[in-house]
């Protein structure tokens, strides 16, 4: 009986500890969401017949207007593009705004690409993502934007 009492006691303590560490009791406005503009990750995927970009900042992507997708990054920051679901390979081509890069995007293995931003106060690059899916060898291209901007 003592063993059962100990188990119940430990269980109740662990439930109490979990409720203390939960953020459910804090109003959502009080939980500060940190957005990292120094190290940005953009994941490229192909889902339900559509190309998608999801970045670590949560910027909205509209597959009907991919050229409106904009990622913000701090001066001197780094960006990494990675392949997600159903992307076989991709490469990044800078169409305009090369001056915002310290190191231009470099594809290491056709599924990861890295770039380092210059220490400029602001700027914009338009770039193309040329990708193939696991369903086809045909190449597709979309043209999002990358904005270099100081953030507080």
Model regions: which residues?
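Short beta-strand element of the conserved SAM-dependent methyltransferase core
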Residues: 22-23, 44, 53-56, 91-95, ...
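Intrinsically disordered/low-complexity terminal segments and short unstructured peptides
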Residues: 2, 20-22, 34, 42, ...
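Contiguous segments within soluble domain cores/interaction surfaces
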Residues: 67-106
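N-terminal edge beta-strand
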Residues: 32-74
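Bacterial Sec-dependent N-terminal signal peptides
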Residues: 1-28
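Residues that cap or initiate secondary-structure elements
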Residues: 48-50, 77, 87, 121, ...
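Hydrophobic beta-strand residues in large extracellular and virion-surface proteins
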Residues: 42-44, 51-53, 79, 90-92, ...
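Extracellular/periplasmic metallocenter environments
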Residues: 108-152
């Amino acid at each position: 009986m003592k063993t059962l009492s100990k188990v119940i006691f430990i269980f109740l303590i662990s439930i109490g500890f979990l409720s203390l560490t939960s953020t459910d009791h804090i109003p959502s406005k009080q939980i500060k969401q940190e957005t990292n503009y120094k190290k940005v990750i953009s994941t490229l995927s192909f889902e339900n017949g559509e190309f998608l970009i999801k970045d670590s900042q949560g910027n909205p992507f509209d597959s009907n207007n991919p050229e409106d997708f904009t990622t913000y990054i701090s001066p001197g920051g780094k960006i990494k593009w990675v392949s997600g679901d159903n992307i076989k390979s991709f490469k990044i081509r800078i169409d305009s705004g090369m001056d915002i890069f310290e190191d231009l995007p470099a594809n290491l293995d056709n599924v990861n690409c890295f770039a380092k931003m210059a220490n400029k106060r602001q700027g914009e690059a338009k770039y193309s993502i040329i990708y193939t899916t696991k369903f086809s060898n045909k190449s597709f291209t979309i043209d999002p934007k990358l904005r270099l901007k100081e953030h507080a």
